[in-house]
Amino acid sequence: MTAIYLMSVLFGLACGQAMSFCFPTEYMMHVERKECAYCLTINTTICAGYCMTRDINGKLFLPKYALSQDVCTYRDFLYKTVEIPGCPHHVTPYFSYPVAVSCKCGKCNTDYSDCIHEAIKTNDCTKPQKSDVVGVSI
């Protein structure tokens, strides 16, 4: 019994190192505009996880494109649009956000992703919250 358990643990570790774990993950964000009365809580999905990558030792002799590493990024996504409540008539109350449908390990595409690693910004509301949002697909 112990040998079977040990082999299954080793197999799991080997597969875990060989496979990437990049998939849509639930994410809650808060959206507010200074002109509007409320903060909106939105539940969406983002791509999260890790991808297998290797750091090459001979960096001086390789072109820059060979030095890029794979990141967990969107394969398929769609945008949803919500209306922020309590906005005056002169302010556009609509906010669009991406929803991850599927993810992949690949190069970061700056057309639709923020590829710069920055310090985590707070994701808080400073105004009264509204939740249970129904998004409108565009």
From Swiss-Prot:
SUPFAM superfamilies: Cystine-knot cytokines (SSF57501). Disulfide bonds join C22-C72, C36-C87, C39-C125, C47-C103, C51-C105, C108-C115. PROSITE patterns: GLYCO_HORMONE_BETA_1, GLYCO_HORMONE_BETA_2. One of its GO terms (cellular component) is cytoplasm. Glycans are attached at N43. Its main location: secreted. Residues 133-138 form a propeptide. Keywords: Disulfide bond, Glycoprotein, Hormone, Secreted, Signal. The keyword Transferase does not apply. Residues 1-20 form the signal peptide. GO terms for molecular function: hormone activity. It holds the Pfam family Cys_knot. It is found in: Secreted. Gene3D superfamilies: Cystine-knot cytokines. The keyword Coiled coil does not apply. One of its GO terms (biological process) is G protein-coupled receptor signaling pathway. Heterodimer of a common alpha chain and a unique beta chain which confers biological specificity to thyrotropin, lutropin, follitropin and gonadotropin. Belongs to the glycoprotein hormones subunit beta family. Indispensable for the control of thyroid structure and metabolism. PANTHER family: GLYCOPROTEIN HORMONE BETA CHAIN, THYROTROPIN SUBUNIT BETA. This is Thyrotropin subunit beta. The gene is TSHB.
